């Protein structure tokens, strides 16, 4: 299975002056933990990291944590563009791909394996977790307008798995129609293509804020 790790973000929401994936959590950069988990997944036999040129040397120094060769891919100005560049860089024999946020450093190797297995057996799939909070929809003034049925709500995570040809087609359609999406599953949704969820549990968090770093450090300290 081919894996693309999206690592071209910034530390803006973290309040940091550099890519958040290079910030330390429990003694290692965030990306190091993500690479270690990916490398420990038996299903993963090719890894590409999509990042910005200014982070290349710092990230390349972490590739050994994967325990297998890692391909560097220069990202674009948005996540959407970066993933499209990642798809272009895949080996010619790639038929399926998992896309994973580098900031989800608590991901367990078995989550990669389960997503890979589900993808090969039944088509597009994403890691997710059922929403436990009551969600409110509000208007521009902050007034509640609706309370969606919680039993139908899942929080999307990564990895997200797709057919390479279908995901490339999805990105081509997005470019042609000027669609802007925050994850790849949204492309399939807009095109009416089915995507299933795989329960990865609530621990597969995305490290985005200083609080997330604290939580991640506590979890890693207990492993």
UniProtKB/Swiss-Prot annotation:
Pathway: Isoprenoid biosynthesis; isopentenyl diphosphate biosynthesis via DXP pathway; isopentenyl diphosphate from 1-deoxy-D-xylulose 5-phosphate: step 2/6
GO molecular function, one term: 2-C-methyl-D-erythritol 4-phosphate cytidylyltransferase activity
Alphabetic keyword roster: Isoprene biosynthesis, Nucleotidyltransferase, Transferase
InterPro entries membership: IspD (IPR001228), IspD/TarI (IPR034683), IspD/TarI_cytidylyltransf_bact (IPR050088), ISPD_synthase_CS (IPR018294), Nucleotide-diphossugar_trans (IPR029044)
Enzyme class: transferase
Pfam families: IspD
EC number in record: 2.7.7.60
Reaction equation(s) it catalyzes: 2-C-methyl-D-erythritol 4-phosphate + CTP + H(+) = 4-CDP-2-C-methyl-D-erythritol + diphosphate
Site feature: Positions MEP for the nucleophilic attack: 150, 206
SUPFAM superfamilies from the UniProt entry: Nucleotide-diphospho-sugar transferases
UniProt GO BP: isopentenyl diphosphate biosynthetic process, methylerythritol 4-phosphate pathway
Site (described: Transition state stabilizer): 13, 20
Family: Belongs to the IspD/TarI cytidylyltransferase family. IspD subfamily.
Annotated function: Catalyzes the formation of 4-diphosphocytidyl-2-C-methyl-D-erythritol from CTP and 2-C-methyl-D-erythritol 4-phosphate (MEP).
HAMAP family: IspD
Protein name: 2-C-methyl-D-erythritol 4-phosphate cytidylyltransferase
Organism encoding this protein: Synechococcus sp. (strain WH7803)
């Amino acid at each position: 299975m081919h894996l693309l790790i999206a690592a071209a973000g910034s530390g803006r929401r973290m309040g940091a002056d550099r890519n958040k994936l290079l910030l330390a959590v429990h003694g290692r950069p965030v990306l190091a933990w993500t690479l270690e988990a990916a490398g420990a997944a038996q299903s993963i036999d090719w890894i590409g990291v999509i990042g910005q040129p200014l982070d290349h040397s710092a990230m390349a120094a972490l590739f050994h944590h994967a325990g297998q060769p890692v391909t560097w891919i220069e990202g674009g100005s948005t996540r959407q563009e970066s993933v499209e560049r990642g798809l272009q860089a895949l080996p010619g024999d790639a038929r399926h791909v998992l896309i994973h946020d580098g900031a989800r450093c608590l991901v367990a190797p078995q989550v990669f394996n389960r997503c890979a297995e589900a993808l090969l057996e039944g088509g597009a799939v994403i890691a997710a977790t059922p929403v436990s909070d009551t969600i409110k929809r509000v208007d521009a003034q902050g007034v509640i307008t609706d309370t969606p049925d919680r039993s139908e709500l899942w929080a999307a995570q990564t990895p997200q798995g797709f057919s390479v040809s279908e995901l490339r087609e999805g990105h081509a359609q997005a470019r042609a129609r000027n669609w802007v999406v925050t994850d790849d599953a949204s492309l399939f949704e807009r095109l009416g293509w089915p995507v299933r969820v795989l329960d990865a549990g609530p621990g597969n968090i995305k490290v985005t804020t200083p609080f997330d770093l604290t939580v991640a450090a506590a979890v890693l300290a207990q492993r």
